[in-house]
A protein has these predicted regions:
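N-terminal glycine/serine-rich phosphate-binding loop of ATP-dependent small-molecule kinases
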Residues: 1-37, 95, 166-170, 174-179, ...
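Active-site phosphate-binding/coordination module
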Residues: 7-79
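Short glycine-enriched loop/turn motifs at secondary-structure junctions
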Residues: 32-34, 120, 234-236
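Active-site core segments that coordinate phosphate-bearing ligands/cofactors
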Residues: 47, 54-72, 76-115, 124-146, ...
Length: 405
């Protein structure tokens, strides 16, 4: 549809840059045909039996490393999507010749190559984040329940994954031979698209998930999983990232509770935004505990809650306390990242649909106590990918030129 609308402008396309949401896994057979649907990033099913099996048949190397980091390995084994398939769908596991991410599958369909971007490797994967490559040690693949030869070839951020095949050109309308460029996951390219590629700036993305990320010059870790570190949108850069899975989804949830009072979601947002501006900070004694799903590091068994309700509270009080609760979670994430990295963030950039809320932005600025800005274009994920796509084919001399374009 997009290529049809472009018409003759298609000839001006210089490259195609791929980004996608992360931590989605799908097995493929030897003919590169999917064996099942995706296990997506929101799927938190665990496989504790994998931990017991690894301990039972552990090699000496596995025992040695486990003696140093037993807890980390056990956690990875239990949360690995490969292990879930191995123990719950053994016939699929046996037939799997490859496992791919969403961007890897798109690359396969567009170029015919079993390749994927280094920057897309997020989640419970046998990926060495510090060195930006697959692990070199066989026992790590035992932990995750997958083989090295089942993983796609990694391509650095900003390099060429392949070119559009004849078949893909016919199916999509894209020019045959068009370069397809490796980028990174959606949150990492958001940081780049927002122009934040130093530790001095943090990027908050207010979408279904609420996340806060800081691009680092070296990997920063937290052994308690209070935040994650993923490969950044640029080689030799890393994104320290804190998130709550249910971010501004909570605002949608609140609308569902009052949907009968409004003709549309937009009407609800408009009325609540106006009314919430007259609610004092603290939402008249209400507090939202925003962990409606688990958080591995802070609250692995969390349940969301609204604390302080009385018969005098109104819906705008509840609405404001939701905005405050989400912003307080972002402050909590920023604090732990700054403590681990020993670096102070000077400015916060907010993007995503939630950044369009004036009252939400002011609450965020107040709680984080830093200069806080939003961009004219709140959807900067595609912009970050386009910057890398342009640089790869010479449209931009460097990333800075792309950011300023």
């Amino acid at each position: 549809e997009v290529t049809r609308e472009l018409g003759d402008e298609k000839k001006n396309i210089r490259s195609l840059a791929i980004t996608a949401n992360r931590d989605n896994i799908m097995p493929l057979d030897k003919n590169l045909t999917p064996l099942r649907d995706w296990i997506i990033w929101l799927d938190k099913r665990q496989t504790p039996e994998a931990v017991h099996a690894i301990h039972h048949k552990a090699t000496m190397k596995t025992r040695l490393v486990s003696g140093v980091a037993r807890g980390l390995m056990d956690y990875a084994a239990s949360n690995s999507k490969f292990n879930w398939i191995k123990y719950h769908e053994p016939e699929v596991h046996q037939q799997a010749a490859y496992y791919c991410t969403l961007s890897g599958y798109l690359t396969l369909k567009l170029t015919g190559n079993t390749a994927d971007a280094t920057g897309m490797q997020c989640g419970y994967l046998p990926f060495d984040t510090a060195h930006e490559t697959w692990f070199a040690f066989d026992f790590m693949y035992e932990v995750f329940g997958v083989r090295r030869d089942q993983m796609f070839t990694l391509v650095k951020q900003g390099d060429i994954l392949g070119t559009i095949t004849t078949e893909a050109a016919q199916a999509t309308g894209l020019p045959e031979g068009l370069p397809v460029v490796a980028t990174a996951g959606d949150k990492q390219v958001e940081s780049l698209g927002a122009g934040a590629f130093t530790p001095r700036e943090a990027v908050i993305s207010y979408g279904t998930m609420a996340s806060l990320s800081v691009m680092m010059n070296k990997p920063v870790s937290d052994l308690h999983f209070k935040f994650n570190t993923f490969p950044g949108a640029l080689p030799k850069k890393w994104n320290a990232e804190f998130h709550i899975y249910r971010g501004y989804w909570l605002i949608t949830w609140l609308y569902w509770q009052y949907a009968g009072h409004y003709e549309s979601y937009d009407e609800f947002l408009s009325e609540m935004t106006t009314a919430a501006q007259s609610v004092p900070p603290g939402s008249r004694g209400l507090f939202l505990f925003p962990f409606f799903t688990q958080h591995e590091g802070f609250h692995p068994d969390a349940r969301g809650s609204i604390v302080g309700l009385t018969d005098t509270h109104r819906r705008e009080d509840i609405y404001r306390c939701f905005l405050e609760g989400i912003a307080f979670a972002m402050r909590q994430g920023l604090d732990v990242i700054e403590k681990a990295s020993h670096q102070k963030t000077k400015r916060v950039i907010v993007c995503g649909g939630g950044s369009q809320s004036d009252v939400g932005m002011q609450i965020t600025a107040d709680i984080l106590n830093r200069p806080t800005v939003r961009l004219d274009n709140v959807e900067v994920c595609a912009i970050g990918a386009a910057i890398l796509g342009g640089k790869a084919v010479g449209v931009f001399k460097n990333v800075e030129e792309g950011i300023n374009a």
